[in-house]
Amino acid sequence: VPHLRFPEFSGEWKKCKLGDLCNVLMCKRILVSQTNTEDGVPFYKIGTIGSTPDAYISKELFDDYKVKYNYPRKGEVMITCAGTVGKCVVYDGEDAYFQDSNIVWIDNPTQYISNGFLFHLLSKVDWRKLNSTTIIRIYNDDLRNLKMSYPRKEEQQKISHLLSLLDERIATQNKIIEDL
């Protein structure tokens, strides 16, 4: 149970591993020869997820892969597993494709944990503690074995809402500072 808590909630938080509740999935590999830099469906890589894409795939390839292979549902949490590890983005449901094992998503049925709460939980993990090597990578088993605690859904919603408001406020303040 956290030290700071909304007064209307009580009781213990449940403890588990992320893999007890969710699965870790990724898109089918896209070859460089299947991309272009001008038009089509955005193809996000670890350096572009959450911002502007610099590569695209054909609509036909996208439609084919979306039907045949794993593809995220709107609201699911995506996470970068190489390069800048641990960057989390909530999938907005727009047509896009993602770089295979470098970007994975948490296939979360939301029965026990909301995607909003999961986003904030995963965003706060210090992924540098995973490896003793210089090059850090998050493996699927690292995510599945991640120990976590979570409250009832009502409390998750309230926590997620508050943290989202704080994130928005911080982003606004950072923008103001940048514009000075």
Please state what every model-predicted region is.
Residues 3-28, 51:
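Non-catalytic DNA-recognition/assembly elements of restriction-modification systems
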